[in-house]
Amino acid sequence: MDTRVKTATLFDLRSWSAGCLDRVERALERWVTAEAPAGLDHGAPAELVEAMRYAVLDGGKRLRPLLVLAACKAVQGNEGAAMRAACATELIHAYSLVHDDMPCMDNDILRRGKPTVHVKFGEATALLAGDALQALAFELLTPEDATFPAAMQAQLCRLLARAAGSAGMAGGQAIDLASVGERLSERQLRDMHELKTG
């Protein structure tokens, strides 16, 4: 009788992440383009589309999409729906960075070593690009040809809206802006950062 323990195949996080990141990049490239089925084929001005693409396709760690795809893998969920949700979270993140960098917020001129969207395209286009990225995120969660029920689509939209809205990221940013020059307790800082990260 063979008493040796068979070694289970270990999950290769690095390989899995690289594959997911490649798929996320391709999906973002497909959905944030002038030919995209998710709404940008309606004659969006070229500069707006260019600003949106600049904001989203400029790299980044893509941690949020990886977390969504990891959750999908853990529960053996629908990979197509998960990719849409993964990209939606990245679009929300990108829109928040575009707005956060603007002069009325943090007035950053560089992001990831490149001029911020408002520096490259102007404030008005940056604001609209951020707004359009946010709208596109919700559109990705509600495809016309969805293989998952409308009630689930609505629930996903509700969750994302809460995480990004006044009870989440936007609320945290409002606290951040209101507290400039103020001394915050560790608890207040923690609460603000928890809200800002959705």
Regions found by a protein language model. Name each.
Residues M1-A88, I92, V98, M105-D106, ...:
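Conserved N-terminal diphosphate/IPP-binding helix and adjacent helical/loop segment
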Residues L28, Y95, A137-L141:
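Alpha-helical membrane-inserting segments
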Residues A34-E35, L140, E144:
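A general secondary-structure boundary signal
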Residues H42, G59-K61, A124-D131, A135-L136, ...:
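All-alpha helical catalytic cores of prenyl diphosphate-utilizing isoprenoid enzymes
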Residues A82-M105, R158-G172, T197-G198:
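Active-site alpha-helical segments that house and flank conserved acidic catalytic motifs
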